[in-house]
Every structure is written in structure tokens, then in C-alpha cells.
UniProtKB/Swiss-Prot annotation:
Pfam families (UniProt xref): DnaJ (PF00226), Jiv90 (PF14901)
Biased composition (Basic residues): 219-228, 687-699
Protein name: DnaJ homolog subfamily C member 14
Pro residues bias spans: 75-84
Biased composition (Low complexity): 662-673
Organism in which the protein naturally occurs: Bos taurus
Length: 699
């Protein structure tokens, strides 16, 4: 093993009596002189028979140099292998030069001593200094500029041609040194990456000292060291190969030592483990099994106790919660009963008091007067008045806050309001984009602005400004804010121009009037289509469409199924255990409930029969015809004729047979007259003949 020697700057081996040693001479590990000696280890046997490495009495290698000491100024200049040092501050150049002189003297003495002894075990590399005077003395790594690359050249080796390098900048790039995983493999002869070279400048007046000498802190000294390193790099290519070989060999040697130490530790650990396993007995396994069983039983017991504790806690908590809910329910029920009792008692007290004081008749008169049409008409006029609407707007805007009045909210989704708005700009943009596809002629500007149709110009202007601030593309960064602003601008153009606003109001009034007329016409038409004329009361009865198909329209109690029906079939069905009779008929391909018409006609039909008892004819009987008559397709329905006659004020007598269109054949206008003859059986006068005539076919 190797360790630092306290008296030398490099690495020294163990004691000369034994142990492996690696020694380098000089104040630092210099690539010029390297020495190796044999490796020798000793081993001994432990009391248990295991062979292991024994320690020597001489100092042993403990660890590679601590990198923390390289930056600690209290330990002096670092010696031995270490990382390449960064560029030193100019203020420390003088101290470095003094230390370099001492290191050079020690190096000369050591080299001279070993040359005198004639030791041939050292590998000597001749100096490349070409000076005639002083022989080449390798400089320490902490000399000028701490540049170890110039250790093989003296300061006399500076060629005049190096001055030309001052005008070049970045011509030759510095090569990075070999990097090894271990810090011990780094030697002072490594090339450190030099910073970017700068042009040489003439020293200023403040850079010189008294007597004309140059300030040693000036950066020119470091540039001189870099110039020498560049010259060494270009001239000593052969020497660099030897240095790299030495570095690689030293790094491999340290790697081998670390590998041997690691393998020895693992072998020793495995030996202890094997020895411990050999000492085990059969009883130890039994004890281990018993120990595992005991701990397994303990863990199982703890798990059971924990499970029981959790289950009991859960059950207890659930019971408490249910009891609490029952208690709350009982309290609420009690409070409700007390409230109802108090209300009933109070109402009885008020009624008795009013009876004694005679207020009951007055209260009845007041309530009847409030429910009168006159009071309702007065309330409607008050609500439609402009002062009342202004008061409502003031309350809704928040100018007059009342605790029982809610603040104004959006009428449609997120529609803006004239004041007190809490809508977000994104919501307003989304609302306006829903109306982007509406044409401008059909656009409702009041809905876009979020105001009433009766809003004043001031309200419209205020609403437009508020929306413009939220929707404008310069204020809102929504990708479709421009489209929303176009919709808002179109609405504002309509209401801001008096002529366009008047035109829009006239158009809206016409549309409202037209829609009202159309709605009335459709409602009357729907009513007419869902009514039947009655010849007995000369009125109309409603009919209701049923959700039944003609193929399964009639219910038969004998077959317990539904039978198909034909056009004009008239039958009855019972429900509610026979207490309710409902009459049905198939007209225009649909099943209708005509119970009102049948009740007015006083038709008596047995319900749930297998055969159709009666048939409704929609056309008058022609002479010489009998049986069922079908309505002619050219004649319009009787209900539509009556409806059109009422609209156009045409008296029924002017229509031929009640037909407004004067059809050549007897139209269905005679349905009302023929219905009693066709539906009401003549059993009252001639019951037998009527049955034979009306039931000629079997169902």
C-alpha cells in the first residue's frame, strides 16, 4: 500500500522492511523520475483457521489524498497526485514564484544524489532545455502561473518567434488532459485547460512600479507561461507520449490496488459468513422455527385485536349516528306539530274574535273585492304604467335595496343587464356567439344588449358601453371576440339610429300581430278538428284521440283480446268493474273517444261485445241504397265546413245540404241530421225491424 510521507512532497512507500512501495522523488510527482519496487504482502491465519491479510508494523496505505486539502490553505501547497488547478489570482504570483524556487533547489539536490548513487532503477527522462549555461531543471507545478506543462523547459527557452503568437487568438485549441475515475491518477504534469488567450497590451502607467519594474500581478506573466506551454506543445510531441504512458501506467496501478482491496474485503466477508453457517446446529433451526411461530402467533393475535377494535368502533359509531338521526327526526316532527297546532289555535282565535267584533263580514267583502275583475284591471293598469316600471327598475338595479326584493338577474342565461352586472367576459362572448349566425334583419337588438324593449336611450347606451368593454378584441383575448363584437355592433346600429329603430319596432309589431292571428286561427282549427256536431243540442262536443292502432282497437270480453276496427265503427268498453262506460269510434284512420257526443245522443250500447253494434255514416243515404255509406272523398269534413261558415259569416241555409262548396253529391253536411237516424236505433218504435236492418253482416 502507499501513503503520503510527512517529510516528502510526493508519494512514498511503506517501511523498507516490507510491504509494497511506490516512490516518487522531488517536491511533487515529476514525470521525469519515477521509481517502482516489488510488491509484497504477508498473510496469517486467524484462530478459527481462516487465512486473512495481516497488518505490518510499518505505515500502511490508508486512502488517496483528500481533495478537501487541495483547497485548504492551512495545508500548504498540495503535493502528490491531485486535480489540475484552476488559474491562480495574480495577487498570489509572487508567493508561488518563491515556493517554486525552493522546490527547484530540492529537486536539484535529490536528482544529484541519485545520480551519484548510480541507481539504475529510476527512469530518467532527459531535459529538453537547449540552453548552454544552466542545465534543464524541471520546474515544479506551482511555479509561474502554475503551468506544469512547462516543467521541462527553463525560462531561457523562450524563442523570439513566440512573440508572433501574441497577435493570434484561438489559433491552437488547448487539448484536455486524460481524465481517470480516481483522483489519485492525476499528476501535476497534466495539462490544465487554459482560458482564452487575449492580445498583448502595452502596460499602462499605473501597472508599473517605482524604478521602472513591472508589477508582478500584471496578467502578462501568465500569458508568458501560456506561450511557453504552447511552444512545449508544438516542440515536445515525443515527450508527451512518454508522459501519457506514465500517467496511464500509474492510473492502472492504482486501479489494480483498489480492485485487490475490494476483492479482499469481499473474500473476507464471505469467509466469515461461511464460518458462521458452519457453526449452526440442528437445534438452531428448531429454535428458529419456534421463534417464527411465536412471532406469527403474536402478529395474528394483534391483527385480531385490531380488527375487533375497529369493527366494534364502527358498529358503535353507526349506532350513535342512527340514534342521532332518530333524535333529529323526532325533534323536527315535534316542531312541525307545535307549529301546526299554534297556527290552528291562532286561526281559531282570529275567527272567534272577528265573529264577536263583526269583522268576518268585512273581511269577506274585502277578499271578494280584491278578487273582483275591477281590482284586477286596476292592478294590470298600474303594472303597465311607466312610473311603476321605473320604480321596478330602480329596485332591481340596486339603487333602492329592499330586503324582500331580489336583485335583478339575467333573463336568459347570461344576458347582461344595464346595471349591477356580475357576468364574466367569457360568458358574454359565448352568449353573443350563439347569435352570430342570426341574420341582421332577424336580430333582436334588445336581447343582444340585455335590456327591455321599453328601455330608454340612456339605458341602451350604458348597456352597450359595458358590453363593449368586456367583448372588444383589444380587451378580451378570446379567439372569437371579434365575431361577438360584430353582433354587438350590429345591435347598437339598429337601436342608435332613430329611423332604423322605428322601422324595427313597426316590423316587430306586425310580426306580433301576424303571429297572434295565426295562433288564433290554428287554435280554432284545432278545436274544430277535435269536435263533433250534435243534432240533438245543435252544438259541438269534443273528441279525444286515443293511442291505439286500427288493427287492435276494440276489446272483446269473450275472446279477451283486441279486434281490428274499420272506418266508422262505433263501440263501447267498460272500466272500473263496469261502473264506467266509454264510447269509441274509428274516424279518419284514428281511434277517438266520443263519450260526450254519445252521452248527448243517449246511445245505449252493450260494452265489450264481440261484434260491432253500430256504424257511423258520414254521408247521407241515397235513394235505393242501404247498408253502410262511406263519405265521398271530394266533400270536406263537416266540422271544417262549419268552421269556415262561421269565419266568412255564411248562413247555413245558403249552403246546399250544409255544404259550403256546393258539392254535386250530398255532402257530409247532412251528418248531423243523419246521425240520429244512423246511430240511434229505432227500437223504440220498431225495434225488431231495426235490428234486422242494421246487423246484416257478421263480424
Amino acid at each position: 500500500m502507499a501513503q503520503k510521507h510527512p517529510g516528502e512532497g510526493g508519494l512514498c512507500g511503506a517501511h523498507h522492511s516490507g510491504g509494497a512501495s511506490l516512490r516518487t522523488l522531488g517536491p511533487s510527482v515529476d514525470p521525469d523520475i519515477l521509481s517502482f519496487s516489488g510488491l509484497r504482502d504477508s498473510a496469517g491465519s486467524a484462530p478459527n483457521g481462516t487465512r486473512c491479510l495481516t497488518e505490518h508494523s510499518s505505515p500502511k496505505y490508508t486512502q488517496p489524498p483528500n481533495p478537501a486539502h487541495w483547497s485548504d490553505p492551512s495545508h500548504g501547497p498540495p503535493r502528490g497526485p491531485g486535480p489540475p488547478l484552476a488559474e491562480e489570482d495574480p495577487d498570489q504570483s509572487e508567493a508561488s514564484s518563491e515556493e517554486s524556487g525552493v522546490d527547484q533547489e530540492l529537486s536539484r539536490e535529490n536528482e544529484t544524489g541519485y545520480q551519484d548513487d548510480g541507481n539504475s532503477s529510476f527512469l530518467s527522462i532527459p531535459s529538453t532545455c537547449n540552453c548552454q549555461g544552466t542545465p534543464g531543471i524541471p520546474e515544479g507545478p506551482y511555479s509561474e502561473g502554475r503551468d506544469s506543462s512547462s516543467s521541462n523547459f527553463c525560462h531561457h527557452c523562450t524563442s523570439p518567434a513566440l512573440g508572433e503568437d501574441e497577435e493570434l487568438e484561438g489559433e491552437y485549441d488547448e487539448e484536455e488532459p486524460l481524465k481517470f475515475p480516481s483522483d489519485v491518477s492525476r499528476v501535476p504534469s497534466e495539462k490544465k485547460p487554459a482560458p482564452r488567450r487575449q492580445r498583448h497590451r502595452v502596460p499602462a502607467k499605473e501597472d508599473t512600479r517605482e524604478g521602472g519594474r513591472r508589477d508582478p500581478r500584471s496578467p502578462g506573466r501568465h500569458r508568458l507561461g501560456r506561450k511557453r506551454s504552447q511552444a512545449d506543445k508544438r516542440r515536445g510531441l515525443g515527450l508527451w507520449g512518454a508522459e501519457e504512458l506514465c500517467q496511464l501506467g500509474q492510473a492502472g496501478f492504482w486501479w489494480l490496488i483498489e480492485l485487490l482491496v475490494l476483492v479482499g474485503e469481499y473474500v473476507e466477508t464471505c469467509g466469515h459468513l461461511i464460518y458462521a453457517c458452519r457453526q449452526l446446529k440442528g437445534s438452531d433451526l428448531d429454535l428458529l422455527r419456534v421463534w417464527v411461530g411465536v412471532w406469527a402467533g403474536r402478529l395474528r393475535g394483534w391483527a385480531q385485536v385490531m380488527f375487533q377494535f375497529l369493527s366494534q368502533g364502527f358498529c358503535y359509531g353507526a349506532g350513535l349516528f342512527t340514534r342521532f338521526l332518530r333524535l333529529v327526526g323526532a325533534l323536527l316532527l315535534l316542531a312541525l306539530a307545535l307549529l301546526l297546532g299554534c297556527l290552528q289555535l291562532g286561526w281559531r282565535f282570529l275567527v272567534g274574535l272577528s265573529d264577536r267584533l263583526g269583522w268576518r263580514d268585512k273581511a269577506t267583502w274585502i277578499f271578494s273585492w280584491l278578487a273582483s275583475p275591477t281590482w284586477q284591471r286596476c292592478l294590470i293598469l298600474l303594472r303597465e304604467s311607466r312610473p311603476w316600471q321605473q320604480l321596478v327598475r330602480i329596485v332591481q338595479w340596486g339603487w333602492l335595496e329592499l330586503p324582500w326584493v331580489k336583485q335583478r338577474t339575467n333573463r336568459q342565461a347570461n344576458a347582461p343587464v344595464a346595471g349591477g352586472r356580475y357576468c364574466q367576459p367569457e360568458e358574454e362572448v359565448a352568449r353573443l356567439l350563439t347569435m352570430a349566425g342570426v341574420p341582421e334583419d332577424e336580430l333582436n337588438p334588445f336581447h343582444v344588449l340585455g335590456v327591455e324593449a321599453t328601455a330608454s336611450d340612456v339605458e341602451l347606451k350604458k348597456a352597450y358601453r359595458q358590453l363593449a368593454v368586456m367583448v372588444h378584441p383589444d380587451k378580451n383575448h378570446h379567439p372569437r371576440a371579434e365575431e361577438a363584437f360584430k353582433v354587438l355592433r350590429a345591435a347598437w346600429d339598429i337601436v342608435s339610429n332613430p329611423e332604423r329603430r322605428k322601422e324595427y319596432e313597426m316590423k316587430r309589431m306586425a310580426e306580433n300581430e301576424l303571429s297572434r292571428s295565426v295562433n288564433e286561427f290554428l287554435s280554432k282549427l284545432q278545436e274544430a278538428m277535435n269536435t263533433m256536431m250534435c243534432s240533438r243540442c245543435q252544438g259541438k262536443h269534443r273528441r279525444f284521440e286515443m293511442d291505439r292502432e286500427p288493427k287492435s282497437a276494440r276489446y272483446c270480453a269473450e275472446c279477451n283480446r283486441l279486434h281490428p276496427a274499420e272506418e266508422g265503427d262505433f263501440w263501447a268498453e267498460s272500466s272500473m268493474l263496469g261502473l264506467k262506460i266509454t264510447y269509441f269510434a274509428l274516424m279518419d284512420g284514428k281511434v277517438y273517444d266520443i263519450t260526450e257526443w254519445a252521452g248527448c245522443q243517449r246511445v245505449g250500447i252493450s260494452p265489450d261485445t264481440h261484434r260491432v253494434p253500430y256504424h257511423i255514416s258520414f254521408g247521407s243515404r241515397m235513394p235505393g241504397t242501404s247498408g253502410r255509406q262511406r263519405a265521398t272523398p271530394d266533400a270536406p269534413p263537416a266540422d271544417l265546413q262549419d268552421f269556415l261558415s262561421r269565419i266568412f259569416q255564411v248562413p247555413p241555409g245558403q249552403m246546399s245540404n250544409g255544404n259550403f262548396f256546393a258539392a254535386p253529391q250530398p255532402g257530409p253536411g247532412a251528418t248531423a241530421a243523419s246521425k240520429p237516424n244512423s246511430t240511434v236505433p229505432k227500437g223504440e218504435a220498431k225495434p225488431k225491424r231495426r235490428k234486422k236492418v242494421r246487423r246484416p253482416f257478421q263480424r
